[in-house]
Swiss-Prot record:
Belongs to the chaperonin (HSP60) family. Keywords: ATP-binding, Chaperone, Mitochondrion, Nucleotide-binding, Stress response, Transit peptide. It comes from Euglena gracilis. This is Chaperonin CPN60, mitochondrial. It comes from the Eukaryota. One of its GO terms (molecular function) is ATP binding. GO terms for biological process: protein refolding. The lineage of its organism: Eukaryota, Discoba, Euglenozoa, Euglenida, Spirocuta. The gene is HSP60. One of its GO terms (cellular component) is mitochondrion. Implicated in mitochondrial protein import and macromolecular assembly. May facilitate the correct folding of imported proteins. May also prevent misfolding and promote the refolding and proper assembly of unfolded polypeptides generated under stress conditions in the mitochondrial matrix.
Length: 569
């Protein structure tokens, strides 16, 4: 079948392409970016406003999370939607890398694109202006590094988390306590609670540095994770290519009506396709994960997981053969398994605690016998995974809407706190970017730059003042007055406390941002804005008119069941 036929059968059809060039293309894209930014920017700061989002099913969603607002927006005009999609992608990228800063990146991208568009219409070279923007970003990043301060104490961790949770002290304290319990590099997850209160629980858990083989296994579209409970775990020291290799296992879990996690060297070809089809059709709750590590280290880690979950590693070299003889006792078990793109977390494995302790003692003994720094690193890594608990923040609330909104804030706060631990903190409330604008004043006067490049520098200088202005505006203040006062005093740690409506030392007041979040927001925003400024043509699909309602399709009899296992395969 040709490509058009395939698309049509998937419910998508178009009647050709629509193209806009130059100013016409940029005007339309800018309109979409402006509208998206306006909706997102109202959430910025401690007094940011709520946004209500209609849901396809159930009650409307109420949120102050910038990336959630951005994801919900889609315009009828396809060219406006192009611009919105590009900025929405920036927000997603910023969120994935730094865990926060999505609203800041959206505001910055909108300003850089808007000011850049005006400059281009007045005759500025978009290419030279883009070079100026890139130079300005480098200078701002250097300034942010100089302003940053290493985060050390539990109090500082709590402050960062509180700010990212829109001033919720309870969430900040929970995250600070969680990091104290499992360490700054420890595993912390967020889940739905069963009470009105938000609680912290530290459970026995193990994390692996590998995620799902295919995104089709995802069960939670929002978090892009596979979340399953009471799961059997099959550990395979080989590649699984055909479904026949694991058919007895699938028959067993289908009868038991339990989910299955397969951790193997790889799962591909027919086996992967069959698992995905049956998962999508609701016949199996399953997820395939590639085994972590390489060589002997991979083998050892599989055995570590086996001991933690109470299972065995399937290895044909030891005479095992699932097709001829399957013993369900080789399967491990865990109360909960959470699988992301790059990480798998196994909670409450069914392994014998005594066996786990013996395994840890064995690894410690091996540590004392090796002189290889590489082997020591891998042994320490295995020991940490077996020893480390997992902190679970259980979010409670009076309704699903309240729990959902609170989970957004907890996740944002957790991600921002991790970013703060990795690269330090800077004055919050937009102050760090505001003070970086002083360094750009010097760059804008650099005689080696062309006038068009200087225009690019001035655009960034204007844009990085806007987050501070927006935060003050959302709190009911005069943004221009506040930033003028701060720049005039030139006290690099001074800022405006929008919650209290007064000027304070931001570090002392605990109003701080992770340096990584601010840097990532700026880099991503400047990148996409620069691309839109230099865009000379935009192409979209012209949707085909909806077909008239008619009768059912003749000649399509019922689809026959697939043989074996009651139509599963």
């Amino acid at each position: 079948m040709n490509r058009a036929g395939v698309l049509a059968r998937r419910g998508y059809s178009s009647k050709g392409k629509d193209i806009l060039f130059g100013v016409d293309a940029r005007v339309k894209m800018l309109a979409g970016v402006n509208r998206l930014s306006q909706a997102v920017s109202v959430t910025l700061g401690p007094k940011g406003r709520n946004v209500v989002i209609e849901q396809p099913f159930g009650a409307p969603k109420i949120t102050k999370d910038g990336v959630t607002v951005a994801k919900a927006i889609e315009f009828k005009d396809s060219f406006e939607n192009l611009g919105a999609q590009l900025v929405r992608q920036v927000a997603n990228t910023t969120n994935e890398i730094a865990g926060d800063g999505t609203t800041t990146s959206t505001v910055l991208a909108n300003t850089i694109f808007s000011e850049g568009y005006k400059a281009v219409t007045q005759g500025t070279s978009p290419v030279d202006m883009k070079r100026g923007i890139d130079r300005a970003v480098e200078v701002v990043l250097q300034s942010l590094t100089e302003q940053s301060k290493t985060i050390v104490s539990k109090e500082e961790v709590t402050q960062v988390a509180t700010i990212s949770a829109n001033g919720d002290v309870e969430i900040g304290q929970l995250i600070g306590h969680a990091m104290e319990k499992v360490g700054k590099a420890g595993v912390i997850t967020v889940s739905d609670g069963k009470t009105l209160d938000t609680e912290l629980e530290v459970v026995e858990g193990m994390s692996l540095d590998r995620g799902y083989i295919s995104p089709y296994f995802v069960t939670n579209a929002k978090t892009q994770k596979v979340e399953i409970e009471d799961a059997f775990i099959l550990l395979c020291q080989k590649k699984v290519s055909t479904i026949q290799q694991i058919l007895p296992v699938l028959e067993h879990i289908a009868k038991a009506n339990r989910p299955l996690v397969i951790i193997a060297d790889d799962v591909d070809s027919e086996a992967l396709a069959t698992l995905i089809i049956n998962k999508i059709n609701g016949k199996l709750k399953v997820c395939a994960v590639k085994a972590p590590g390489f060589g002997d280290n991979k083998t050892n880690m599989l055995h570590d997981v086996a001991i933690f979950t109470g299972g065995e590693v399937y290895n044909e070299e030891l005479g095992m053969n699932l097709e001829q003889h399957f013993d369900h006792r080789i399967l491990g078990f865990a109360k909960k398994v959470s699988v992301g793109k790059d990480q798998t977390i196994i909670l409450n494995g069914a392994g014998d605690p005594k066996a786990v302790e013996e395994r840890k003692e064995l690894i410690q003994g091996m540590l004392g016998k090796t002189d290889s720094s590489y082997e020591k690193e891998k042994l320490n890594e295995r020991l940490a995974k077996l020893s480390g608990g997992v902190a679970v923040i259980k979010v409670g609330g009076a309704s699903d809407v309240e729990v959902g909104e609170k989970k957004d804030r907890v996740t944002d706060a957790l991600n921002a706190t991790r970013a703060a631990v990795s690269e330090g903190i800077v004055p919050g409330g937009g102050a760090a970017l505001l003070y970086a604008s002083s360094a750009l004043a010097e760059l804008a006067a650099d005689p080696t730059l062309t006038e068009d490049q200087k225009t690019g520098v001035r655009i960034v200088m204007s844009a990085i003042k806007l987050p501070a202005i927006t935060i003050v505006k959302n709190a009911g203040g005069e943004g221009a007055v506040v930033i003028h006062q701060l720049l005039a005093e030139k006290k690099m740690q001074q800022g405006y406390d929008a919650q209290q409506g007064k000027y304070v030392n931001m570090f002392e007041a605990g109003i701080i941002d992770p340096a990584k979040v601010v840097k990532t927001a700026l880099v991503d925003a400047a990148s996409v804005a620069g691309l839109m400024i230099t865009t000379e043509a935009a192409i979209t699909d012209i949707p085909a008119p909806a077909p008239a309602a008619g009768g059912g399709m003749d000649g399509m009899g019922g689809m026959g069941g697939m043989g074996g296992m009651g139509g599963m395969y």
